[in-house]
């Protein structure tokens, strides 16, 4: 896992979800572990798209349920 991408994703997750940075691990799930609801998830995807200048289609966004999966998707772009 690219550490630089992970750190950027972590920063965005902490800002968007207002969670403790220590809780943001590659295995942390957005809904269960970090308390994101559906609106939080949409806003998080939009923030990631803007930060990394990518587009994440809705059908892909629905499968990204952990911090690690978000990083992997961004790495693949």
Curated annotation (Swiss-Prot):
Which keywords does UniProt give here? Answer: Cytoplasm, Fatty acid biosynthesis, Fatty acid metabolism, Lipid biosynthesis, Lipid metabolism, Phosphopantetheine, Phosphoprotein
- SUPFAM superfamilies from the UniProt entry: ACP-like
State the pathway, as annotated in the record.
Lipid metabolism; fatty acid biosynthesis
Function of the molecule: Carrier of the growing fatty acid chain in fatty acid biosynthesis.
Q: What is this protein called?
A: Acyl carrier protein
Q: Which domain of life is it from?
A: Bacteria
Q: What is the lineage of its organism?
A: Bacteria, Bacillati, Cyanobacteriota, Cyanophyceae, Synechococcales
This entry carries the following GO cellular component terms, namely: cytosol; membrane
Q: How is it modified after translation?
A: 4'-phosphopantetheine is transferred from CoA to a specific serine of apo-ACP by AcpS. This modification is essential for activity because fatty acids are bound in thioester linkage to the sulfhydryl of the prosthetic group.
Family listed: Belongs to the acyl carrier protein (ACP) family.
Q: Where in the cell is it found?
A: Cytoplasm
Carrier domain segment(s): 3-77
For biological process, the GO terms are: lipid A biosynthetic process
| UniProt gene name | acpP
GO molecular function ontology, one term from the record: acyl carrier activity
The chain residues annotated with the modification O-(pantetheine 4'-phosphoryl)serine are: 38
């Amino acid at each position: 896992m690219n550490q630089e991408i992970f750190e950027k994703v972590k920063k965005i997750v902490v800002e968007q979800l207002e969670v403790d940075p220590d809780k943001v691990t590659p295995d942390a799930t957005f809904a269960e572990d970090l308390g994101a609801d559906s609106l939080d998830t949409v806003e998080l995807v939009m923030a990631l798209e803007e930060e990394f200048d990518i587009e994440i289609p809705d059908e892909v966004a629905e499968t990204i349920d952990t911090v690690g999966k978000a990083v992997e998707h961004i790495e693949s772009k």
